[in-house]
Each structure stands twice: as structure tokens, then as C-alpha cells.
């Protein structure tokens, strides 16, 4: 067999083995299966005629949430810890504030009451199971618009992770309040001890 014929046969064989592009997943995550994850990125909040921005890191370990906010929006640095029963805020001076004081501090710093319990689920691109909700085009996944607790959450971009679509960019609005979230990095673990 000549060299030219050999190259032709090899080219045809490799062409038949080419891998077709894989479409991104079109399903939203099941919150019960996504209990352990971290997300970090940027956020901007406008409320009461004022606005601010900052960076954030969100860690979810089962029912426990740890949200760290840095930059002007957090007035330096602020960490929010929730477990479904209590809320604790650690401010830039290292002071730990219990539920009532923590809620007042968040309202003062952010200019509004953010639905943090629901936001845990909105971060995943799904409604919170704790209150009624409506989903636009429910038959289409991933979810593009959620309406819940007086808020409208619109999703613009998604990233593939563990076979599902996770939000990269979304905006939550209620009246004159507008929260924009951009996730730069997702890390998802299947069980405790496996990361993230």
C-alpha cells in the first residue's frame, strides 16, 4: 500500500471516530441531591435609592449556610451563618450578633430584608420548597424565571456541573430592590468529606 493510500485510510478511519459535541445539560438540580456546595463570585444590590457591590462566598453543608460578603456592600467584611433555626452575623470587628441583632444589622447594611432562606435555593436555580412559587415555562429546563415570596428571579446564564445546569448569572427583583448575582466558581460535592 502506498504512503498516500495509507494516509487516506487513516484519515477516513479517524473521521469515523470523531466525537460529536455534547450538548450542555438541560435539567435543574434536585436540592435534595445538592446539599454540599460552595459558590463564589460578585453581587450588586440596589435598594431604597442606594446601591453597592461586593464579592461573596457561599458555603452550603446540609442545612447550614455560611455566606461571606466582602467589599462596600458588606462594609468591609461580614459573615452570615444560618442553620434553619438561628441566624448569626459576624461583623468586620469580629463581633457575633444573634438572630434579632443580626437581622437588624443586615437590614441596615443592605437597605432591605433579603430572603436568605429562599436565596439558598435560588442560587441553585430552583424554587424554595418552603413557600408557594410559580415557574415560567415549567416544562422547559433549566428554569429561566421564578416568582416567589413577592420576588421575581430571572436567570441569564448557566454552567454545567455534575450533569445539571447551575446558574452563572441571575437577577432577583422586588419592588425597588434589585439583587444581581454573578457566580465565578462552583464546587459541588456528593457527600460530606468529599469537598468542596
Residue ranges and their predicted role:
Residues 13-34:
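Bacterial Sec signal peptide processing site at the extreme N-terminus
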Residues 33-73, 77:
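Post-signal-peptide N-terminal segment of Sec-exported extracytoplasmic proteins
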Amino acid at each position: 500500500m502506498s504512503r498516500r493510500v495509507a494516509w487516506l485510510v487513516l484519515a477516513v478511519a479517524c473521521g469515523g471516530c470523531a466525537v460529536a459535541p455534547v450538548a450542555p445539560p438541560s435539567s435543574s438540580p434536585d436540592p435534595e441531591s445538592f446539599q454540599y456546595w460552595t459558590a463564589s463570585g460578585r453581587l450588586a444590590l440596589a435598594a431604597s435609592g442606594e446601591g453597592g457591590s461586593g464579592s461573596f462566598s457561599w458555603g452550603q453543608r446540609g442545612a447550614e449556610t455560611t455566606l461571606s460578603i466582602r467589599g462596600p456592600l458588606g462594609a468591609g467584611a461580614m459573615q452570615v451563618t444560618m442553620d434553619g433555626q438561628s441566624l448569626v452575623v459576624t461583623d468586620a470587628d469580629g463581633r457575633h450578633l444573634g438572630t434579632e441583632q443580626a437581622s437588624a444589622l443586615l437590614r441596615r447594611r443592605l437597605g432591605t430584608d433579603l430572603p436568605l432562606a429562599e436565596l439558598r435555593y435560588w442560587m441553585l436555580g430552583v424554587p424554595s420548597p418552603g413557600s408557594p412559587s410559580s415557574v415560567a415555562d415549567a416544562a422547559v429546563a433549566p428554569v429561566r424565571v421564578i416568582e416567589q415570596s413577592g420576588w421575581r428571579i430571572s436567570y441569564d446564564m448557566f454552567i454545567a456541573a455534575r450533569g445539571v445546569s447551575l446558574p452563572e448569572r441571575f437577577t432577583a427583583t422586588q419592588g425597588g430592590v434589585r439583587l444581581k448575582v454573578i457566580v465565578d466558581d462552583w464546587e459541588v460535592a456528593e457527600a460530606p468529606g468529599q469537598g468542596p
